[in-house]
C-alpha cells in the first residue's frame, strides 16, 4: 500500500456552508456534444485497433471545436440557414506494419451516427459539416505506448498529471444532475417533444433556499405561438419543481429561460433543439467533469477526459478511478460520511503506481481504526487500473 495516504477532512462540509453552486450541461449543449463526439471517436478507434492489431494503439482525439451555424426558428417551424461545423482534432496511429487505419473517415461516420441517435431534430447530413483533422502522434509518445502494449505489461503513464473525485453527492448536486436527466430522458421526450436536448441547469443554494435556473431549448415546430410556449414552459417548470422538492428538505424554486421577453415574442426556441444551430459554439473540456457535474465548491481537475486514450492517459483514468475510490469508501464503510480522493502520476511510470493516492475522509470515529480498510479499497482500485480501458469501451464510465 505504498504511497496511499489517509487523512481527515478539516474543513466544513460544502452542504453546511452558507452558499453553494452546481452546474450541469445537458447532452445537447455544444460543449457536451464536443465531449461525446471526441469520446465516441476514441471508443471507435480503440475497437478498430483491437480488431486490426490485437491491442489499443496510441491516440488522443481530445480536441473538438463546434462552430455554431445560422438558423431561423419560428413558431410552428423554421429552417437551418447555415450548417454547424464540427472540427474533430487529435493524434492517432494511422499506419502500423503496413496496415492503414482510416481515422478521418471513421470520425465522420461516428459523429454522424451519434448526432442522429441523440439530437432528435438535427439532421447530421444537412445541418452539420464534420471536419476531422487527425495526425500521427509524436514518436516518443508512440514509442512509450508500444513499449508496454507489445510486452503486455502494465501501461505507463503518458503524462505527469492528477485526478480527483468525491462522494457522495449532496442534495443540490443530486437535484442539478437529476433535473437534466429527467428532461433528456426518452420517456420525457416522448410526452414532451417540444423540449430540446440543449439543457443547462444551474443550481444555487443560499442557506436553505435552492434556486434552479434552467436554459432549455424548445423545438419550434412543436410550439404553435407565444401563449403555447408560455404554457408549455410553465408545465415543464412545475414538473421539475415537484421532482426537485422530493430530493431535499430545503425550499426549491425553479426558473426556465429567464431571458425570455414574451411581449416582444423573443423566447428560446430552436429548429434543432440545440443552440449550436446559431446561438452558441462548443469545445471539449468546457463542460461537465467525469461525474457529470461542474462543482466549483468541490475539488476538480481541469483535464478533459473525453477523447483521451483509455489505456494510459492519466487525465482520463485517474479522474474516474478517484471517483470510484471515494464512492466505495463512503458506501462500504458506514462510519465514513464523505470522502475525497486525489491521485497524481509520473510520466513513464506504471499507471497503478501513483506518486500519491490521498484519501481524505469525514468521520466521527477514530480515523486510525478505519485506515486499513480505506487503504485496502484504494489498493484494490489501483490494481484494477490496467483493465480500466475495458469499462470505457463498454461505456460504463461517463466522461461528461
Curated annotation (Swiss-Prot):
Reactions catalysed: L-methionine + ATP + H2O = S-adenosyl-L-methionine + phosphate + diphosphate
Enzyme class: transferase
Gene: mat
Keyword set, alphabetical order: ATP-binding, Magnesium, Nucleotide-binding, One-carbon metabolism, Transferase
GO biological process entries: one-carbon metabolic process; S-adenosylmethionine biosynthetic process
Names of the cofactor(s): Mg(2+)
Entry-linked NCBIfam families: PRK04439.1-5
InterPro entries, alphabetized: AdoMet_synthase_2_family, AdoMet_synthase_3, S-AdoMet_synthetase_arc
Transmembrane spans: none
Protein's UniProt name: Probable S-adenosylmethionine synthase
Keyword Cell division: no
Family classification: Belongs to the AdoMet synthase 2 family.
Residues binding ATP, per UniProt: 135-140
Stored Pfam families: AdoMet_Synthase
Function statement: Catalyzes the formation of S-adenosylmethionine from methionine and ATP.
Native species: Aquifex aeolicus (strain VF5)
Pathway in which this enzyme or protein is active: Amino-acid biosynthesis; S-adenosyl-L-methionine biosynthesis; S-adenosyl-L-methionine from L-methionine: step 1/1
Enzyme Commission numbers on file: 2.5.1.6
GO MF annotation: an example: magnesium ion binding
